[in-house]
Swiss-Prot record:
Species of provenance: Human papillomavirus 59
Gene Ontology biological process: DNA replication
Crosslink feature (Glycyl lysine isopeptide (Lys-Gly) (interchain with G-Cter in SUMO)) location: 552
SUPFAM superfamilies per record: Origin of replication-binding domain, RBD-like, P-loop containing nucleoside triphosphate hydrolases
EC number from the UniProt entry: 5.6.2.4
PTM note: Phosphorylated.
Protein name, per record: Replication protein E1
One Gene Ontology cellular component: host cell nucleus
């Protein structure tokens, strides 16, 4: 049997713990050391100076000396910085840096400086000492303020400069008797910190100028609303900057009326400005803030009252006095409201004058009349009275209805030659009739044949009352027909409305009618129901909400891709239509413009050159003294002219 691993016999042999004790025997005759006393008791006194600590004491003393020196240097540096800051911000300092250092000896610099912007104590401004420079900077610095703070022991006072509060000792106290209680900047800061800034500015404005700011302006709720005229009240402007405001604002405005008054807040500027282009309130505020170095929160910006006679009179009277500086021409609304006669006329509105204006300008649509008449309110007293009226919608409807009646009656009394002459007088000179002739030749139409057909067409000769332009697509049929329709101010009818009983109602008020792109179903309808209309004979037309009216159908121009004369489905149309074929496509230049220009001026030149050919030289029995085919229409009473 094998022996067990490891060692056996626990605690025996060399495998356990054992104790070794050295035994020294002193023998007789051994030499004893001189510095060792064998019989003396060991007290440990020989180890007292074993470690030399003199070096540590010297280092500690040096550190304490350096700390004290550092404190003194820091106090002196703080005093110098305080002196520079007080001089920079206009504060007077009466204590030397040595006194400030002595007062701070008991405190460390970190304990002396405490940031306390919103200090609850009373803040007072130090006396401003004149500096060698002129002014501080372009941006006005915050005034230095002093806060007197009494602690529980009553041995410390503080002064605040800008946003930092630095405690000073009793020896460095400022002279409280020489402190000015208020200053323009402090007042302005109070304005900025007030709960209702606008109310404070309104009150100050009324106190200075003697009237409310709201008496001069109207209110824009949105800051994005654009206007060219603005009234601004700017508070707390530096006097030097205020003197140059007239020169600074001149490149941006067409008119400027500037007034400046001094108060405890500084200079308050009241200005009426007319900019070269429309601006909103935000843009105006940014521009003025850049020029005057005043935040936009210290400004009142609103548009002026354009219809207030009192406000206009204020600007007019103050503009003539020496308290205002005026640049540019006076706005028209001030001139208009300061004329006595105009002010009297504004109170009376004359509907007949409005109708006469709409008639002279060929306006029959209610929307067009309302918009155009409102635009001339600055120069027309009756239009201004119309805008002030509470019955604008009623007046507008009555004006449009009466104008249409007058226009309809006038047109009915005019023959075709008179109407063409009237239209030619309305169009500018400078046209050329050759493009029309060249286009007809390009399409293979004989010019003399076309003139003969056009003469019968304009006279409304029976069986010759309708011209048809037929041919493939894109040959210029609609282009040619629409240009003639526009010149003669005709009307368009569409077969898509043929299911309505009133689709022919436009024929009652026009000298010419056009139906564009007639299809087979349209020709079938004409062959069934419109034979008399194509003949040029009287027909009965149904009108909406009105009784039937009997009229002679005006000349009708029709375009189509189908030739109705060659089609056997409509045999009764052959003798009632004058057909001209347009087989060639309309040519365009490289800019996609028609090669043959056909417009109102060219048609005017065409009718003037072919006037005799078309037999339009009828004797005008009703011509007035100016040579017009009829007398000028007047629906307003004339005024007697008093001669000298």
């Amino acid at each position: 049997m094998a022996d067990s691993e490891g060692t056996d016999g626990e605690g025996t042999g060399c495998n356990g713990w054992f104790f070794v004790q050295a035994i020294v025997d002193k023998k007789t005759g051994d030499k004893i050391s001189d510095d060792e006393d064998e019989n003396a008791t060991d007290t440990g006194s020989d180890l007292v100076d074993f470690i030399d600590d003199t070096t540590t004491i010297c280092v500690q003393a040096e550190r304490e000396t350096a700390q004290a020196l550092f404190n003194v240097q820091e106090a002196q540096r703080d005093a110098r910085e305080m002196h520079v800051l007080k001089r920079k911000f206009g504060c007077s300092i009466e204590n030397s840096s040595e006194k400030a250092a002595a007062g701070k000896k008991a405190k460390s610099p970190l304990q002396e400086i405490s940031v306390n912007v919103n200090h609850p104590k009373v803040k007072r401004r130090l006396i401003t000492v004149p500096d060698s420079g002129y002014g501080y900077s372009e941006v006005e610095m915050l005034e230095t303020q002093v806060t007197v703070e009494n602690t529980g022991n009553g041995d410390s006072n503080g002064s605040v400069c800008s946003d930092s509060q630095i405690d000073c000792s009793d020896s460095s106290n400022m002279d409280v008797e020489n402190i000015v209680p208020t200053s323009p900047t402090n007042q302005l800061l109070q304005l900025l910190h007030s709960k209702n800034k606008k109310a404070a500015m309104y009150a100050k404005f009324k106190e200075l100028y003697g009237l409310s700011f709201q008496d001069l302006v109207r209110t824009f709720k949105s800051d994005r609303t654009t206007c060219s005229d603005w009234v601004t009240a700017i508070f707390g402007v530096n006097p030097t900057v205020a003197e140059g405001f007239k020169t600074l604002i001149q490149p941006y405005v067409l008119y400027a009326h500037i007034q400046c008054l001094d108060c405890a807040w500084g200079v308050v500027i009241l200005a009426l400005l007319r900019y070269k282009c429309g601006k909103n309130r935000i843009t105006v505020a940014k521009g003025l803030s850049t020029l005057l170095h005043v935040p936009d929160t210290c400004m009142l910006i609103e548009p002026p009252k354009l219809r207030s006679g009192v406000a206009a009179l204020y600007w007019y009277r103050t503009g003539m006095s020496n308290i205002s500086e005026v640049i540019g021409e006076t706005p028209e609304w001030i001139q208009r409201l300061t004329i006595i006669q105009h002010g009297v006329d504004d109170s009376v509105f004359d509907l007949s004058e409005m109708i006469q204006w709409a008639f002279d300008n060929d306006l029959t649509d209610e929307s067009d009349i309302a918009y155009e008449y409102a635009l001339i309110a600055d120069s027309n007293s009756n239009a201004a009275a119309f805008l002030k009226s509470n019955c604008q919608a009623k007046y507008l409807k009555d004006c449009a209805v009466m104008c249409r009646h007058y226009k309809r009656a006038q047109k009915r009394q005019m023959s075709m030659s008179q109407w063409i002459k009237w239209r030619c007088d309305k169009i500018e000179e400078g046209g050329d009739w050759k493009p029309i002739v060249q286009f007809l030749r390009y399409q293979g139409v004989e010019f003399i044949t076309f003139l003969c057909a056009l003469k019968d067409f304009l006279k409304g000769t029976p069986k010759r009352n309708c011209i048809v332009l037929c041919g493939p697509a894109n040959t210029g049929k609609s282009y040619f027909g629409m240009s003639l329709l526009h010149f003669l101010q005709g009307t368009v009818i569409s077969h898509v409305n043929s299911n309505s009983h009133f689709w022919l109602e436009p024929l009652t008020d026009r000298k010419l009618a056009m139906l564009d792109d007639a299809t087979d179903s349209c020709w079938t309808y004409f062959d069934t129901y419109m034979r008399n209309a194509l003949d040029g004979n009287p027909i009965s037309v149904d009108r909406k909400h009105r009784h039937l009216v009997q009229i002679k159908c005006p000349p009708m121009l029709i375009t189509s891709n189908t030739n109705p004369v060659t089609d056997n489905r409509w045999p009764y149309l052959n003798s009632r239509l004058m057909v001209f074929k347009f087989p060639n496509k309309l040519p365009f230049d490289k800019n996609r413009n028609p090669v043959y220009t056909i417009n109102d001026r060219n048609w005017k030149c065409f009718f003037e050159r072919t006037w005799c050919r078309l037999d339009l030289n009828e004797e005008e029995e009703d011509a007035d003294s100016d040579g017009h085919p009829f007398a000028a229409f007047k629906c307003v009473t004339g005024s007697n002219i008093r001669t000298l």
